[in-house]
Amino acid sequence: MKGGKSKAKSDNKLAVKKQAADTKKTKKAVKDPNKPKRPPSAFFVFMEDFRKTYKEKHPNNKSVAVVGKAGGDKWKQLTAAEKAPFISKAEKRKQEYEKNLQAYNKKQAAGAAEEEESDKSRSEVNDDDEDQDGSGEDDSEDDD
């Protein structure tokens, strides 16, 4: 039988790759919905205004890419003085974000300390019950 060994090797390699891909998917961290969002940069503050004016001038345009391209070109053409109001708005939002983030981190630290204490008290209560599964049977296996 030709190719039997190579097919087995390739099937084995494929199985290993699938397992690796499956483990990568499960490792993704869950985002906390209460965490404050990062503030927009000066360019994105500019784009908020630019999108409104662009839609007024071009109401039939549905392409996001075209709006983004036009906004990027316009941003590049602006002088530093014209960019200044957007930069200052971005700085204000950044300062507000930093305050919110500090408050969030304090709240998380306080919550973690409370959770740790509750885990300690819970473990003291449940120490006796850890070996019991509620079935009334002994967990050890007998080979009769």
From Swiss-Prot:
Organism expressing this protein natively: Ipomoea nil
Transmembrane segments: none
Coiled-coil region(s): none
Region (Disordered): 1-42, 85-144
CDD domains named among the record's database cross-references: HMG-box_AtHMGB1-like (cd22005)
PROSITE patterns, A to Z: HMG_BOX_2
GO terms for cellular component: chromatin; nucleus
Record localization: Nucleus
Tissue and organ distribution: Expressed at higher levels in dark-grown tissues, such as roots; and at lower levels in light-grown tissues, such as cotyledons and stems.
Family named by the database record: Belongs to the HMGB family.
Biased composition regions of type Acidic residues, renumbered to the chain: 126-144
Record Pfam families: HMG_box (PF00505)
GO biological process: chromatin organization
A single MF term (Gene Ontology): chromatin binding
Classification via InterPro entries: HMG_box_dom, HMG_box_dom_sf, HMGB_plant
Residue ranges: DNA binding: 36-105
Name recorded for this polypeptide: HMG1/2-like protein
The entry's keywords: DNA-binding, Nucleus
Induction note: Regulated by darkness and by a circadian rhythm.
Bias (Basic and acidic residues) ranges: 8-35, 89-99
